[in-house]
Amino acid sequence: MSSPSAPLATPDVELDVHTLSSENLPWLCIVWDDPVNLMSYVTYVFQTVLGFSKKRATELMMQVHTEGKAVVSSGEKDKVEGDVKKLHTAGLWATMQQAG
């Protein structure tokens, strides 16, 4: 086994702190798989509550079903809170978190 000769140089990188600030990151609405709701109902909710086309609603429902969760909306905190509340009212398991 050879020993390292010299540390690798790292280039000088200036980070724009404002760009990386968590305040600038969008919020995500995540729907989680649950043992209660039928796939057809989840698709229906995505169409009627979030306004997705049947094709997109089906794709998101399948992502929830196969991967356990899907991001169904993103944006400002107030908007995403509203989406989570609507999904809860429809009986789906939804949470929100900040991207990043």
From Swiss-Prot:
InterPro entries named in the record: ClpS (IPR022935), ClpS_core (IPR003769), Ribosomal_bL12_C/ClpS-like (IPR014719)
Disulfide linkage:
none
* Top-level taxon of the source organism: Bacteria
Q: Name one GO biological process term.
A: proteolysis
**Pfam families xref list:** ClpS
Extent of the signal sequence: none
Q: What does this protein do?
A: Involved in the modulation of the specificity of the ClpAP-mediated ATP-dependent protein degradation.
> Which HAMAP family does the record cross-reference, listed alphabetically?
ClpS
Q: How does it assemble?
A: Binds to the N-terminal domain of the chaperone ClpA.
The similarity comment for this entry is:
Belongs to the ClpS family.
Instruction: Specify the protein name.
Output: ATP-dependent Clp protease adapter protein ClpS
